[in-house]
Swiss-Prot record:
InterPro entries xrefs: PRC-brl_dom, PRC_barrel-like_sf, RimM, RimM_N, RimM_N_sf, Transl_B-barrel_sf
Name recorded for this polypeptide: Ribosome maturation factor RimM
Gene: rimM
Organism: Lysinibacillus sphaericus (strain C3-41)
Compartment list: Cytoplasm
Protein family: Belongs to the RimM family.
Domain notes for this protein: The PRC barrel domain binds ribosomal protein uS19.
UniProt-listed Gene3D superfamilies: PRC-barrel domain, RimM
Length: 171
């Protein structure tokens, strides 16, 4: 089964089973809503424990969660420094707006110019604030391609292919 990180359990909080989460998702409200089911992975463990969110609140830069049936610090302590993940099935497209994609859909795509020349493969995405920048590993060097309308002309996630307009100085 393919898993995707949505948060890291950095510590416990209090004695009533709250855990302190550092979010790694763009969809915090949806992922950490009361009643949602997540997979909790203990540190250095490959086997998940299914958890259901019982309560959620913000505290400083963290999200504090409690899980159903785990209302004691002793029950959540083993998950400290672990990860919270969702399955690919839980990554629904209704969270995305038009021309938005999940990172896992873009990473691994082959980038080609409008003329058909292969530029490389997307191996990372940098979030710069203004727009995302794709790190494309070419045969000789890495290229940084901004995800903007003037450059990215077509994205086919099924075929894992992206067509870009190569502006002067881009590569």
């Amino acid at each position: 089964m393919e898993w995707f990180n949505v948060g890291r359990i950095v510590n416990t909080h209090g004695i009533r089973g709250e855990v302190r989460i550092l979010s790694t998702t763009d969809f915090e409200k949806e992922r950490f809503a009361v009643g949602n089911k997540l997979a909790a992975f203990k540190k250095d463990d490959k086997k998940p424990t299914g958890v259901t969110i019982q309560s959620v609140r913000r505290h400083k830069n963290f999200i504090l969660l409690t899980f159903e049936g785990m209302n004691n610090i002793n029950l959540v302590e083993p998950f400290k420094e672990g990860l919270l993940k969702v399955t690919k099935d839980q990554m629904t497209d209704d969270l995305l707006e038009e021309n938005e994609f999940f990172f896992h859909e873009i990473i691994g795509c082959t980038v080609v110019s409008e003329e058909g020349e292969t530029i490389g493969v997307v191996n990372d995405i940098l979030q710069t604030g203004a727009n995302d920048v794709w790190v494309v590993k070419g045969s000789k060097k890495e290229h940084y391609i901004p995800y903007i309308e003037d450059i990215v002309k077509d994205i086919d996630v099924d075929e894992k292919k992206i067509v870009i307009h190569v502006m002067e100085g881009l590569l």
